[in-house]
Regions:
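Short, small-residue-biased leader/transition segments that mark boundaries at the very start
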Residues: 1-3
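A translation/RNA-centric and nucleic-acid-associated enzymatic feature enriched
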Residues: 7-185
């Protein structure tokens, strides 16, 4: 039987960077990224989450699950997507991802049930979309309507089967295991 490790997002981040995630400003993350040669200039983005994602994907993720699978929990609340905020730390969300050999194999979360919170998150996302030159998305979508009626408490997990196959076959890219990659479709 294979066991796995469990680590909070902020702890994994700190272990690899020495930075305290929730005490680091966008400017501090930008400086760290320049100093560690992830980007050439600190004006790559004005968004805290962009810097967190860059550092996580380039420095933290490649080292996750080196010996055995690891579940990364308590993602920043700003990256909650459709997850509930954690009752024990509202800076974080009840969201997790499973990594093995630096590859994300699965992700899941405890589903948000509050339609007001969903609308608030959609408004925040739409402001960012408009800033990025994209069209805003409708706030009162089918999920919002379902929450208003009464959505049952639930959670879910999505497994990237293609990624599991890639690791099992010791392939170096998904292209090697997907029968119809986009460029051959």
């Amino acid at each position: 039987m294979c066991s796995s490790d469990l680590i909070r997002f902020d702890q994994a981040f700190s272990n690899e960077t020495g930075l305290s995630l929730f005490e680091s400003s966008q400017l501090a993350l930008a400086r760290w990224s320049v100093d560690n040669q992830l980007v050439e200039r600190g004006d790559w983005s004005n968004d805290w989450d962009d810097w967190v994602n860059l550092i996580f994907s380039m420095r933290v993720q490649p080292k996750l699950g080196a010996k055995r699978p690891v579940l990364v929990t308590h993602f920043p609340a700003s990256q909650a997507a459709l997850a509930k905020l954690a009752a024990d730390d509202e800076r974080t969300a009840e969201r997790y991802e499973l990594f093995y050999h630096g590859v994300e194999l699965a992700n899941g979360y405890h589903e948000l049930l509050n339609p007001s919170e969903l609308a608030n998150r959609a408004q925040i996302a739409n402001r960012q979309r408009i800033e990025d030159g994209k069209f805003p998305l409708p706030i009162e979508n089918p999920l919002f309507q379902a929450m208003k009626i009464g959505f049952p408490d639930c959670c879910g997990c999505a497994l990237g089967f293609d990624r599991v196959v890639m690791l099992a076959c010791q392939a170096t890219s998904l292209r090697e295991v997907i029968p119809f990659p986009a460029d051959r479709a």
